[in-house]
A protein has these predicted regions:
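Gly/Ser-rich catalytic serine loop of serine hydrolases
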Residues: 130-132, 198
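A structural feature that tracks compact, well-ordered secondary-structure segments
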Residues: 135-137
Length: 246
């Protein structure tokens, strides 16, 4: 690939780490946010994100020797963000010279990165356990049917983390029931639940959740990278997405 080739980039900016994946190159950055730049003084959320990504892009260009800009990017965002927040995320990337910006909700990306078939009618349940945010979602036909989230305020030991995860899953089940989506509840009992994010590696978490809910629970391969891997699966579709935008 030419050093001047225009890049397509998958981005996952979490509370503690930022991960960048370049199409045809794989993960090129997986670092603590604090290591990238001095971020004190950036109170505006958009400017903060732009500062983080500017430092991340500079680090990638330095390491790879590529002289080209990122042309198109797909960024994972929390489920349920407002239209204003979406514009902030998009604006941060546009300010860095990224021409085309696409957003994908983190639970959807996590499920895709974990290898779940999100487009089929049968439901998938994913719980993404990040450094500060836990998101549990039920997905069917490439859409999020239900999503519940909880901020991790302070350190949670394994017992309290397990209780929090179980509570979020049960809230999703109740939401599906209230919407009359009983078939999705049956799907979850059959297909089980997938755990992603660094917190998924908590010792005994998967088995405790499985026992409490009486369904299969698995931890994704490389759960910390599930979101960015899922975002990367969108990159080959960018040409068609751009066409659909008009």
């Amino acid at each position: 690939m030419s050093l001047w080739a225009k890049l397509d980039c998958a981005i996952d900016v979490g509370a503690s780490r930022v991960r960048l994946l370049l199409r045809d190159r794989g993960v090129v950055l997986d670092e603590s946010v604090d290591e990238l730049d001095e971020l004190d003084g950036f109170r505006d959320r958009g400017r903060l994100l732009a500062a983080i990504l500017k430092a991340a892009f500079a680090r990638v260009h330095l390491r790879t020797g590529w002289l080209c800009p990122v042309r198109r990017a797909v960024l994972a965002v929390p489920a349920g963000v407002s239209e204003m927040e979406k514009r902030i995320f998009e604006g941060a990337l546009h300010s860095l010279g990224v021409k085309d910006v696409y957003l994908i909700e983190s639970p959807m990306a996590a499920a895709m990165g974990a290898g779940s078939s999100v487009a089929e009618p049968k439901a998938t349940c994913v719980v993404d356990i990040g450094a500060r945010l836990i998101q549990a979602a039920v997905i069917s036909l490439a859409g999020i049917v239900s999503c519940r989230s909880s901020e991790r305020t302070g350190a949670l030991d394994a017992k309290r983390l397990t209780a929090r995860v179980i509570e979020l899953i049960r809230d999703n089940i109740e939401d599906c029931r209230s919407k009359g989506r009983f078939n999705l509840i049956d799907d979850l009992a059959e297909k089980g639940i997938v755990l992603t994010g660094g917190g998924a590696l908590t010792t005994g978490l998967a088995s405790a959740v499985s026992e409490a809910l009486n369904c299969p629970v698995r931890v994704a391969d490389q759960p910390q990278l599930a979101v960015v891997y899922g975002v990367a699966k969108v990159l080959p579709e960018l040409d068609s997405l751009r066409t659909s935008r008009g």
